A protein has these predicted regions:
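A generic structural signal for well-ordered alpha-helical segments
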Residues: 71, 112, 134-135, 160, ...
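A conditional alpha-helix N-cap/helix-loop micro-motif detector
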Residues: 76, 146-150, 177
């Protein structure tokens, strides 16, 4: 019977997850298990060899909550519509939207909680050590826009099939395009999942966000493409038309709710302390993430 080290603890803070733990407590805790092929080392990381996942679920939940606290503190005027149309937590799907701001993915992820997602990101975003580590930990994978590889399609398909995470995609590919590209159609068809459209209507600039302009997230009808037998040019065009049509319908529907009415300014008495707290937590998170980025590589523990 082989005894393997499964946990090391030191310090004061915990991140719990199925295969990845930071333990910062006041004393060292040693645990041995004859059943699990696990190990730990002085770097304070626990890694379960038996299971590969697409990011750290606990860190994802933590970071999503922290970013939403910051957005709530500086804006606090977000509204979510037709959330009853979102598929159940047991179903994987592709959440698609026209990419309009830097923060619309956060609102998308928050509105669909507790569901977690993986998402594509241009490779340049991974060059920053801390931000790149954050998005990798949350399940992001890099895409080379100039020379896209087969993994850009293969990886999200495997995630949708083998895990309980869904996929966020912006079919236009960037914030400067409205054309729906074919990647989402191929992934949805091969993974046999539905496409869930959502639109963001709200401030396009940081100034507008801080001035508390209204944010509306409107969810559409899930799009089933199982009736399209072949994903040739014609099939991809049919999917693109369905997605674009739903985007246009959602934008038109949102007009009835969207206005420039701002919340009571007295709310700032609550939001300012919340923002200060969020910033302090963010600073601690940045410091800890910088240290952790030298220790833990999320790429070694993802679905292939």
């Amino acid at each position: 019977m082989e005894l393997t080290l499964t946990r090391i603890s030191t310090g004061f803070y915990d991140f719990y997850q199925t295969n990845f733990h930071f333990y910062w407590r006041w004393k060292l805790v040693w645990e041995f298990s004859p059943k699990q092929k696990t190990f730990a080392c002085p770097s304070m990381i626990r890694y379960n060899k038996r299971k590969k996942i697409e990011g750290d679920t606990m860190f994802y939940t933590y970071l999503r909550g922290l970013v939403m606290l910051i957005l709530w503190s500086i804006n606090g005027n977000a509204h979510y519509h037709n959330t009853d149309k979102i598929p159940s937590q047991d179903e994987n799907y592709i959440l698609v939207a026209p990419h309009r701001t830097w923060w619309d993915p956060v609102y998308m992820a928050f509105a669909t909680k507790p569901k977690q997602f993986v998402f594509m990101a241009k490779k340049e975003l991974f060059s920053n050590r801390i931000f790149g580590w954050w998005i990798r930990m949350c399940g992001a994978f890099p895409i080379d826009r100039e020379n896209p590889s087969a993994s850009a399609i293969k990886y999200p398909i495997n995630v949708l099939k083998k895990s309980d995470r869904s996929l966020i995609m912006f079919p236009s590919g960037s914030r400067h395009s409205n054309d729906v590209k074919g990647g989402v159609a191929l992934i949805a068809k091969m993974a046999k999942v539905r496409i869930m459209p959502v639109t963001y209507t709200g401030p396009m600039t940081l100034k507008g966000l801080i001035s508390r302009e209204r944010v509306d997230m409107n969810f559409g009808n899930p799009i089933d493409i199982s009736d399209i037998k072949k994903m040739n040019d014609e099939g991809i065009e049919m999917v693109a038309e369905r997605i674009q049509s739903e985007f246009q319908r959602l934008d038109e529907e949102t007009k009835q709710w969207h206005n420039n009415k701002k919340p009571n300014p007295l709310w700032w008495f609550i939001r300012i302390p919340a923002l200060i707290l969020a910033v302090l937590v963010a600073i601690i998170t940045i410091i800890c993430s910088f240290i952790a980025s030298f220790i833990w590589n999320p790429e070694k523990n993802k679905i292939n």
